[in-house]
């Protein structure tokens, strides 16, 4: 009984240790990478797609959400505006914002943030997405029986602070969403294959689907490939026996 208890406590202890170590290491690495912005009081919004598209959509979504809440509290009616002539020559709001903001749970915070502080919240959330990506990668490593906390921490930092990761922080922040969801989807597949409940997989599929349809089909494709690979590796002995049986059957026929 004591051996079983110690076996259960070890992953929890390693998980807490990883969380603290990774959080501290991420703060240090983020400060080293972006200290120039902090010193010069600059945001992480680049003057191209980041400013014209993503940040504009972030601010618009916050204003859009506040207007819905104001209407709800003042008139006690839930009114969802669906068309805005200020978007180009006029466009559907939900269709336009779905690619940029609507669906990402973190962007809901823009509703509670005044427009004058939106740039700071936008920059903070951009880094927070990378932080979550490292956590999800670490969780996947633990399910693969990798219990070396320091190694997983280093791997998570490498996964996050790549050229791609540092590029998307200022250019396309929501490009970090696949980095968060993919390890969780693969983790969900591993849990289902181990006979555990599929709650994590279901929730991750739901969040990935509503966050961005463009990345969702890519995530679905890679998850399917990983699932096939997992099944092939897990039932390799069955395939070997089937091959031997097939060869013996052909030998008997001849």
Where do the protein language model's features map onto the residues?
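Start-transfer (signal-anchor) and selected internal transmembrane alpha helices
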Residues: 1-39, 248-253
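Membrane-helix interfacial "entry" motifs
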Residues: 6-18, 87-88, 115-123, 148, ...
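Membrane-embedded helix bundles of polyisoprenyl
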Residues: 26, 126, 131-143, 148-234, ...
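Membrane-interface coil-to-helix junctions
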Residues: 30-133, 157, 161-169, 173-179
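Transmembrane helix-loop junctions in multipass membrane proteins, especially transporters and channels
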Residues: 41-42, 115, 195, 231-239
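Intrinsic-disorder/low-complexity, polar/charged segments
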Residues: 48-49, 104, 148, 178, ...
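Transmembrane catalytic cores of multi-pass membrane glycosyltransferases
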Residues: 50, 57, 61-68, 216-229, ...
């Amino acid at each position: 009984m004591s051996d079983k208890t110690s076996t259960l406590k070890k992953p929890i202890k390693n998980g807490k240790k990883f969380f603290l170590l990774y959080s501290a290491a991420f703060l240090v690495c983020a400060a080293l990478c972006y200290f120039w912005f902090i010193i010069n009081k600059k945001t992480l919004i680049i003057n191209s797609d980041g400013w014209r598209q993503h940040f504009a959509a972030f601010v618009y979504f916050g204003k859009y959400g506040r207007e819905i809440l104001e209407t709800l509290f003042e008139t006690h009616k839930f009114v969802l505006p669906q068309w805005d002539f200020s978007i180009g020559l006029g466009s559907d709001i939900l269709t336009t914002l779905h690619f940029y903001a609507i669906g990402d749970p973190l962007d809901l915070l823009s509703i509670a943030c005044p427009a004058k502080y939106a740039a700071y919240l936008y920059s903070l959330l951009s880094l927070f997405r990378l932080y979550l990506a490292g956590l999800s990668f670490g969780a996947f490593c633990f399910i693969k029986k990798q219990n070396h906390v320091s190694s997983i921490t280093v791997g998570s930092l490498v996964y996050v602070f790549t050229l791609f990761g540092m590029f998307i922080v200022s250019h396309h922040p929501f490009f970090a969403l696949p980095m968060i969801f993919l390890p969780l989807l693969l983790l969900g597949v591993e849990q289902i294959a181990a006979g555990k409940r599929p709650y994590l997989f279901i929730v991750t599929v739901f969040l990935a689907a509503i966050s961005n349809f463009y990345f969702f089909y890519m995530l679905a494709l890679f998850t399917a490939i990983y699932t096939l690979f997992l099944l092939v590796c897990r039932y390799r002995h069955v395939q070997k026996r089937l091959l031997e049986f097939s060869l013996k059957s052909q030998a008997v026929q001849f």
